[in-house]
Amino acid sequence: MGKYNLILSEYLSFIYNSQSAVQIPIYYSSNSELESRCVEFHSKCLENSKNGLSLKKLFIEYNDVIENATLLSILSYSYDKYNAVERKLVKYARGKPLEADLTVNELDYENNKITSELFPTAEEYTDSLMDPAILTSLSSNLNAVMFWLEKHENDTAEKLKIYKRRLDLFTIVASTVNKYGVPRHNAKYRYEYDVMKDKPYYLVTWANSSIEMLMSVFSHEDYLIARELIVLSYSNRSTLAKLVSSPMSILVALVDINGTFITNEELELEFSNKYVRAIVPDQTFDELKQMLDNMRKAGLVDIPKMIQDWLTDCSIEKFPLMAKIYSWSFHVGFRKQKMLDAALDQLKTEYTEDVDDEMYREYTMLIRDEVVKMLEESVKHDDHLLQDSELARLLSMSSASNGESRQLKFGRKTIFSTKKNMHVMDDMANGRYTPGIIPLVNVDKPIPLGRRDVPGRRTRIIFILPYEYFIAQHAVVEKMLIYAKHTREYAEFYSQSNQLLSYGDVTRFLSNNAMVLYTDVSQWDSSQHNTQPFRKGIIMGLDILANMTNDARVIQTLNLYKQTQINLMDSYVQIPDGNVIKKIQYGAVASGEKQTKAANSIANLALIKTVLSRISNKYSFATKIIRVDGDDNYAVLQFNTEVTKQMVQNVSNDVRETYARMNAKVKALVSTVGIEIAKRYIAGGKIFFRAGINLLNNEKRGQSTQWDQAAVLYSNYIVNRLRGFETDREFIMTKIMQMTSVAITGSLRLFPSERVLTTNSTFKVFDSEDFIIEYGTTDDEVYIQRAFMSLSSQRSGIADEIAASTTFKNYVSKLSEQLLFSKNNIVSRGIALTEKAKLNSYAPISLEKRRAQISALLAMLQKPVTFRSSKITINDILRDIKPFFTISEAHLPIQYQKFMPTLPENVQYIIQCIGSRTYQIEDDGSKSAISRLISKYSVYKPSIEELYKVISLHENEIQLYLISLGIPKIDADTYVGSKIYSQDKYRILESYVYNLLSINYGCYQLFDFNSPDLEKLIRIPFKGKIPAVTFILHLYAKLEIINYAIKNGSWISLFCNYPKSEMIKLWKKMWNITSLRSPYTNANFFQD
């Protein structure tokens, strides 16, 4: 079957290469005769290996199994101690080990000193500044590289060059690691003091990053970039990534636009052959020169030279190399600072009295007016969400930390936990639940902190506020977001848009009389100057709103929100420093409130408006667009004369001067052709994304299993690949093998096969073909899927015990009582299940479930159970459809220009043939009438799964469902009796199927599924009116055609003759599709 199984078997013989090692393949089949041969084959293999006999004869005798059955897993015995890494490493450690320069970084602990110099004793030691936070070890990573190198040492031609480049880079890593010895990890994949004390502190995270980089080397340029980053990041753990990626903000302004895509009135991308010249004042070149000089000062040679060489003609054709450098710079790993430094960073800004009060006033007023505009409709109409705000928040209460560990009693069980949801339950049970009182966060009760680490930036701190803050803010913030959803200015929230829409918006107005101003305001968001005007603006807005209503509950909601702002104006934080906890007055705004994203967007919009209103006193221009996207804002200004160098220079200086008057330390740039913001950058009229997701280092540890992390690793690899950073696929597959193997005993391991890891079951980890999501329809595939479904959900004793306790039961029934007007089992069960699922983030529960999952899996991988699950999956539906399709060759011409140069060839080809899409396909049912009806009267938000279940019930059951949620009987009757209801059935089914087929993930999100070019390849004679069946047939055909094109780079057309008799059967089946959640789908979701 697959390349994976082949590599797996090669990998096993590479790892366990001693005489005592044995590999036993385990096969299965859906054919019962063959299945019994599989079982026989397995038991004989075991017998022979126990008696030390060769397995060769068996392989011949059971050739029918090997030929016709499917590989399930490989069992591997090995009795030699696992110190193989050190032995193998010596072979590669022939170079000179790197010596860290211990003066590069400002903060002493960011220098790569020997651990015992940074932490003299085990008590002082912490791994938090260098923890790779991933459930795989450095020794596994080294093994994976050495396996690849050994496998490819006889390559020829171009492949040989790649081998030599990687070998050369690995020599650096191997020699350095070998000098100190490979650090051994503990059971939790952490590196303890006694392992690290005589080794450089950052050795592990550096080696992981270096391996990730060297396994992504293909060309000579890759090699030069990687070598430089590997060598320098050994010493420079603080500023390297920032230095290397800084020039990009200027580079985007240097490339002429010669043809680009713009958004038209229908919000589609349309080609425009306009020419816009890059107008660049000398000052800009001076700034760039300064950046390149800074790079050279830091020891960089090749990278600045590449940029310098590109500057001679600034062509878009050679720009992908600049994009490559920009992406690579992030792969040096996360910058992890001590919490104290992260907090002080934001407090170091000096206060000056010399600020423009007038501008601050305008800024505050703009914030005030925007808050009013966002909420006035809801307030005037006494929106039910604002009335029942507390209930709404309880339903969406997260299971994140509440900042302190408490002892909680659930029935007979006493546990310690920091989780918000558990604290709420406990407080309710003990009469301590007072959402109407917002706790102070002053010097007596300082805020505990979380952290956010990013490559190339300083560590940022996150407030972990008491849950009362979330309850108080939730409803109001939801309303703000709904407003932002249909306001184009808010690029991040704008309804169903994707980044391509924002791209077309910018390029649309670029011309020889326009310039675009783009600003990175991340410094401003967390600065002290922002905090007073920011919070005051919000408070003033809330005061105005409170006068617009007489509803006591709405006023209460607004007042609680206001109280959170007042409390946070006097905030203190607690920072552990060694074993003392420091309390610091913290005047700035930090993430961690529910409002963070929405409020920052409001503030950033107000900021750029304030600046533009200042600039407009001096210049005459029309503001064509203003956008804010997270920490960035940008605006396109159209002048009535052609733009000149002098104008660009003047506007640029005036803008900077205007920001300076507010003491905002931001990076503001003006260009005529491109922008660069955190999420994307536009150069030469084309769009680029930073491919900067780290694979072998993670930001933080969660409670995900190794399987989950293997799926995330694969998903990250795919995203990087779509964005132009490709890591060797064999290496990724080797990592998946390592991370999905299950230890049975010390010397016994089980490695699942490709079939197990790629079938869409609850255990799916990756796709056997990149970018193509396959839904297996063969007998063996469906058989294994059914078998896995039989053991999907595992129970946890602790969770069951908590769920059985009165504390938990009372909480759930309190929620149900507040929400429901009459009995509604679907909703009550749903709430109980959701609340129980939230318990999973409590470590002991997730551990317990994991153990159960692993033991079930172990049994399964050694012999699949003959279990006939009656559940229907999307596979069954596609399996029914498949036989009625016939394939013929077809031809589609390339008709669109490239606008995303970093895409892999095969994906690019499809977009060039059928076009791209600028919208997300709705896959959550939120557009259906029933969903809108519910949100009109209730704060409850049913999931797409629940809507799918409800909409297929009898009409009177749907009525009862609606009435129980507080929808007036007349509305419920009208709904069920109308045409809208039957449209909804179709619409929700459609959403549900889109959701199951992950149509908004991976590269599918780039393709225009409604392209007429695609439609004309499909011929389905029209029989009878079952829109749902027509829909699934068409969608299946589209996916088939696209998948074929990705794989083969050519097109097919499909003809379907679906018998009318089968249609009704299929339609009935379509209402019973079970959705499958797997590490793979979670990883996709996590990308979101």
Curated annotation (Swiss-Prot):
EC number assigned by the record: 2.7.7.48
Q: Cite the RdRp catalytic domain residue spans from the record.
A: 501-687
Its keywords, alphabetically, are: Magnesium, Nucleotide-binding, Nucleotidyltransferase, RNA-binding, RNA-directed RNA polymerase, Transferase, Viral RNA replication, Virion
Q: Which cofactor does it need?
A: Mg(2+)
Q: Which InterPro entries match?
A: DNA/RNA_pol_sf (IPR043502), RNA-dir_pol_4-hel_dom (IPR042032), RNA-dir_pol_luteovirus (IPR001795), RNA-dir_pol_reovirus (IPR007097), Rotavirus_VP1_C (IPR022071)
PROSITE patterns, sorted: RDRP_DSRNA_REO
Catalytic activity as recorded in UniProt: RNA(n) + a ribonucleoside 5'-triphosphate = RNA(n+1) + diphosphate
Alphabetical GO biological process terms = DNA-templated transcription; viral genome replication
The domain of life is: Viruses
List localization entries. Virion
Gene3D superfamilies for the chain: 1.10.357.80, 1.20.120.1390, 3.30.230.140, 3.30.70.2480, Viral RNA-directed RNA polymerase, 4-helical domain (1.10.10.1990)
> Which SUPFAM superfamilies does the protein's record reference?
DNA/RNA polymerases
The principal location of this protein is virion
A single GO molecular-function term is: RNA-directed RNA polymerase activity
Q: Name one Pfam family in it.
A: RdRP_4
> What is its EC class?
transferase
How is this protein annotated for GO cellular component? virion component
| Recorded family membership | Belongs to the reoviridae RNA-directed RNA polymerase family.
Q: How does it assemble?
A: Interacts with VP3 (Potential). Interacts with VP2; this interaction activates VP1. Interacts with NSP5; this interaction is probably necessary for the formation of functional virus factories. Interacts with NSP2; this interaction is weak.
Q: What does this protein do?
A: RNA-directed RNA polymerase that is involved in both transcription and genome replication. Together with VP3 capping enzyme, forms an enzyme complex positioned near the channels situated at each of the five-fold vertices of the core. Following infection, the outermost layer of the virus is lost, leaving a double-layered particle (DLP) made up of the core and VP6 shell. VP1 then catalyzes the transcription of fully conservative plus-strand genomic RNAs that are extruded through the DLP's channels into the cytoplasm where they function as mRNAs for translation of viral proteins.
Protein name from the UniProt record? RNA-directed RNA polymerase
Species name: Rotavirus A (isolate RVA/Human/United Kingdom/A64/1987/G10P11[14])
